[in-house]
């Protein structure tokens, strides 16, 4: 039997996952982080993108978070997400449309253009698409 660590994924709306996992992969500020049982303690920011859980037995479950924090202790991993969705609940067509709209907004800058807001919308839409693609790859 593989070693496991307890993982909780929560947001302001509530807990979306709580259980034992063999591995957690999340998108941090400096790239992807792989967290296995016994990992050194760590707290880090998370960027928008997928979080992949490898459950007992090897089954994978993918979530999308819009950002947040990751806390790692030797026997516990906690994801505190701004917002979180199961990847299966994401609408790929809607994410592609949001990506196009954000790209258009960046190209059609007006006098009252908010570059940081447009860039954030673009990053979030791209992260949602990346999550859907990662979920498909895992199946």
Swiss-Prot record:
HAMAP family, sorted: ATP_synth_epsil_bac
Purpose: Produces ATP from ADP in the presence of a proton gradient across the membrane.
GO cellular component labels: plasma membrane; proton-transporting ATP synthase complex
Source species of the chain: Pseudomonas putida (strain ATCC 700007 / DSM 6899 / JCM 31910 / BCRC 17059 / LMG 24140 / F1)
SUPFAM superfamilies: Epsilon subunit of F1F0-ATP synthase C-terminal domain, Epsilon subunit of F1F0-ATP synthase N-terminal domain
An example molecular function term from Gene Ontology annotations: ATP binding
Keywords, ordered alphabetically: ATP synthesis, Cell inner membrane, Cell membrane, CF(1), Hydrogen ion transport, Ion transport, Membrane, Transport
InterPro entries from the UniProt entry: ATP_F1_dsu/esu_C_sf, ATP_synth_F1_dsu/esu, ATP_synth_F1_dsu/esu_N, ATP_synth_F1_esu_C, ATPsynth_dsu/esu_N
Pfam families associated with the record: ATP-synt_DE, ATP-synt_DE_N
Family in the record: Belongs to the ATPase epsilon chain family.
Protein's name in the database: ATP synthase epsilon chain
Subunit structure: F-type ATPases have 2 components, CF(1) - the catalytic core - and CF(0) - the membrane proton channel. CF(1) has five subunits: alpha(3), beta(3), gamma(1), delta(1), epsilon(1). CF(0) has three main subunits: a, b and c.
Entry's localization field: Cell inner membrane
Entry membrane topology: Peripheral membrane protein
């Amino acid at each position: 039997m593989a070693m496991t660590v307890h993982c909780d994924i929560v947001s302001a709306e509530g807990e979306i996952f709580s259980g034992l996992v063999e591995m957690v992969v999340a998108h941090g500020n400096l790239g992807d982080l792989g967290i296995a049982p016994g990992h050194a303690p760590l707290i880090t920011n998370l960027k928008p993108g997928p979080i992949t859980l490898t459950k007992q037995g090897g089954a994978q479950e993918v979530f999308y978070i819009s950002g947040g924090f990751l806390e790692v202790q030797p026997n516990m991993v906690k994801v505190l997400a701004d917002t979180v969705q199961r990847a299966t609940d994401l609408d790929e067509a809607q994410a592609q449309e949001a990506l196009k709209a954000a790209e258009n907004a960046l190209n059609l800058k007006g006098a009252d253009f908010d570059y940081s807001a447009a860039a954030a919308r673009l990053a979030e839409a791209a992260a949602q698409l990346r999550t859907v693609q990662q979920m498909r790859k895992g199946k």
